[in-house]
């Protein structure tokens, strides 16, 4: 994976565990450090990303030379200044899921911590891909939007199947989708990044557009889950 070096940011791990500034038992602190190191050994990060031309339709975005149609007012607004986008798919592989299930049987606390570490890891891989796309855009006097995933805003999760086919993701990095539109391996992410002209107005990710807005524990505590 080139220069990809995951940190497994401790503060992010704590946030996913619901940490709100309370005192943490030393045993838990040690377990977190143990899991941060263990997750690096058991994950196999893989990612693909491809540049695609897009066409603005009346109520959707067509991704050229694919069967992927992105429906929704939010994604239309997100990509309104874009003629190209990047489709990306990231996964940590199956081993992390197997290890987490094992710990669920013998040490539930460790299973929860390892899961939080895995969530942190997949987001760090996504950040890495986004940085690559950003750097390439700058070289061409372009810029990018923030990454936008199916399930965010009014972009339905049922685009996942077409999304994976557009990238040939099952063949390239083993990603599949269930009949309920869940990605497998479970610690996987798909996202869209718009390519925009340098100096274009950049949109800010809004919690109110998230499908989990009403139930989000981060928001209730005055925090956000993204940049």
Please report, for each region that a protein language model flagged, where it lies by residue.
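Intrinsically disordered or highly flexible coil/loop and linker segments, enriched in small
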Residues: 41-52, 127, 139-143, 216
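Active-site helix-to-loop segments that bind/position phosphate- or nucleotide-bearing substrates
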Residues: 1-114
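Short cysteine/histidine-rich metal-coordination sites, predominantly Zn2+-binding motifs
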Residues: 223-227
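Short terminal or interdomain "cap/linker" segment that borders an active site or interface and mediates
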Residues: 140-217
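Conserved active-site and cofactor/substrate-binding residues in soluble primary-metabolism enzymes
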Residues: 27-30, 34, 120, 124, ...
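Internal, well-folded beta-alpha domain core
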Residues: 107-166
């Amino acid at each position: 994976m080139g220069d990809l070096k995951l940190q497994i940011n401790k503060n992010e791990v704590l946030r996913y565990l619901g940490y709100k500034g309370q005192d943490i038992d030393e045993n838990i602190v040690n377990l977190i450090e143990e899991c941060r190191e263990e997750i690096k050994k058991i994950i196999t990060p893989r990612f693909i990303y491809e540049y695609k031309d897009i066409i603005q339709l009346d109520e959707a975005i067509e991704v050229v030379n694919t069967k992927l149609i992105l429906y929704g007012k939010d994604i239309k607004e997100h990509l309104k200044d874009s003629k190209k986008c990047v489709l990306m798919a990231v996964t940590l592989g199956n081993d992390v899921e197997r290890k987490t299930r094992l710990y669920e049987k013998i040490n539930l606390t460790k299973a929860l911590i390892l899961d939080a570490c895995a969530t942190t890891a997949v987001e760090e891989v996504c950040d890495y891909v986004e940085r690559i796309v950003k750097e390439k855009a700058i070289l061409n006097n372009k810029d990018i939007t923030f990454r936008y995933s199916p399930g965010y805003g009014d972009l339905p999760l049922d685009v996942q199947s077409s999304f994976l086919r557009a990238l040939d993701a099952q063949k390239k990095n083993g990603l599949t989708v269930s009949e309920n539109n869940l990605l497998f391996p479970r610690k996987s992410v798909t996202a869209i990044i718009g390519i925009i002209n340098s100096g274009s107005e950049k949109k800010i990710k809004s919690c109110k557009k998230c499908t989990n807005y009403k139930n989000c524990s981060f928001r209730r505590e005055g925090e956000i889950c993204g940049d």
